[in-house]
């Protein structure tokens, strides 16, 4: 007879008959303690992940509205959304296995940014470096390297953009078309594909528009490996987003 077995028997004799103790043997107590330890460990892991996310998100380019975006809180109302969710989640889960880029194209407000951010957030928690940047910000930073006061050269910036595990370029096609923009995007995609690094693109343009804007060479490189081209064809639900859903 163990100490705890005797303890529980004495406790039951002292307690009123209408009160039943939570545990009446040492096996149940041990199992409860182990379960509490497991829950505590999971809580600590979640907190550590949240802290890591907060530290990294300041450098990832993911906007505040999308910081909590995940595959779990992506709203599904029809098969089209179910399809892009499944493909995006599989892309993130299989990221280490091969080189694969993605293009999310379609109407504004259809969830392209949500799923791109969900991919980024997932990869951050799995130790990957990601950067989400708009074409406007990208070109602004590039042109900023021309100023005499900048310590960063165009080559330095191109190197940094080519070094992150996943670079996602948003709002492709929103800017006034320029030859310099085409050259820079071409260089970035070329460098990244040559070093087996993945690139993501988000655009309101369709396949024909993307090909016309970026050229066959860039589109061809964006299709290397098990790359994705997902089309978001449904109506915008951005008007229903209040900002507190995530």
Curated annotation (Swiss-Prot):
InterPro entries: DNAC/IstB-like, IstB_ATP-bd, P-loop_NTPase. Its EC number is 3.6.4.-. Keywords: ATP-binding, DNA replication, DNA-binding, Hydrolase, Nucleotide-binding, Primosome. It is an enzyme of class 3 (hydrolase). GO terms for biological process: DNA replication, synthesis of primer. It catalyses: ATP + H2O = ADP + phosphate + H(+). The keyword Ion transport does not apply. The record marks 69 as: Probably involved in the interaction with the DnaB protein. GO terms for cellular component: primosome complex. CDD domains: AAA. It comes from the Bacteria. One of its GO terms (molecular function) is ATP binding. Belongs to the DnaC family. Required to load the replicative helix DnaB onto single-stranded (ss)DNA, to initiate chromosomal replication. DnaC alters the inter-domain and inter-subunit interactions of DnaB, inducing an open ring conformation that allows ssDNA to access the interior of the DnaB(6):DnaC(6) ring. Has ATPase activity only in the presence of DnaB and ssDNA. ssDNA binds to the central pore in the DnaB(6):DnaC(6) complex, making contacts with both subunits. The helix loader is a DnaB(6):DnaC(6) complex with a crack opening large enough to allow ssDNA into the central cavity. This is Replicative helicase loader DnaC. The gene is dnaC.
């Amino acid at each position: 007879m163990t100490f705890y077995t005797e303890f529980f028997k004495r406790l039951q004799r002292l307690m009123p008959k209408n009160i039943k103790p939570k545990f009446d043997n040492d096996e149940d107590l041990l199992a409860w303690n182990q379960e509490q330890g497991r829950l505590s460990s999971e809580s600590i892991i979640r907190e550590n992940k949240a802290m890591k996310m907060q530290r990294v998100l300041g450098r990832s380019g993911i906007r505040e509205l999308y910081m909590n975006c995940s595959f779990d809180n992506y709203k599904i109302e029809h098969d089209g959304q179910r399809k892009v969710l499944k493909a995006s989640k599989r892309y993130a889960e299989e990221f280490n296995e091969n080189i694969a880029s993605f293009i999310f194209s379609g109407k504004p407000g259809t969830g392209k940014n949500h799923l791109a951010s969900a991919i980024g957030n997932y990869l951050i928690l799995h130790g990957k470096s990601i950067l989400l940047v708009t074409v406007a910000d990208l070109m602004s930073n590039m042109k900023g390297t021309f100023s005499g006061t900048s310590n960063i050269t165009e080559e330095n910036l191109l190197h940094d953009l080519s070094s992150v595990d996943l670079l996602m370029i948003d709002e492709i096609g929103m800017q006034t078309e320029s030859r310099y923009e085409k050259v820079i995007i071409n260089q970035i995609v070329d460098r990244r594909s040559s070093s087996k690094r993945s690139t993501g693109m988000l655009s309101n343009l369709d396949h024909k528009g993307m090909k016309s804007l970026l050229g066959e060479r860039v589109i061809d490189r964006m299709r290397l490996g098990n790359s994705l081209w997902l089309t978001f064809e449904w109506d915008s639900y951005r008007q229903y987003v209040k900002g507190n859903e995530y």
